[in-house]
Amino acid sequence: ADVLLELMRRLEAHHTRTLSIYVPEPIFFSAAYRISYDRMCAIIDDVNSRAPSWMNSFRFCLDSPVGKVRRENLNMRDRTSHHLVFMRDGQRIDYPDLPEALDSPGDVKTMLWKMR
């Protein structure tokens, strides 16, 4: 959340409003660049609670073959098999969640190294 908040503040300073933040569709061998659904939800909640009102009106979406889906579209979740099912416009979207064992947050100092 700290990284997103800092980047959003910098965009605001350049008069650029953040409208959407996308989590990319999972592809093979992409685990190093992904986050789990639980961590994504925690980041959304943290950013929304800490960002000023003019900054927290963005939408946080998961990319899917039929378009963007939000957590409000979550229809079913199986934590054992790490499987999520979203429904959008009557279409079912199966989404593999990243197991928590593979989900390790990056170092904030490393991610914001150029901001110092």
Go through each PLM region and give its residues.
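Auxiliary Fe-S-binding modules of radical SAM enzymes
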Residues: 12-116
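Catalytic cores of alpha/beta
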Residues: 1-11, 69-70
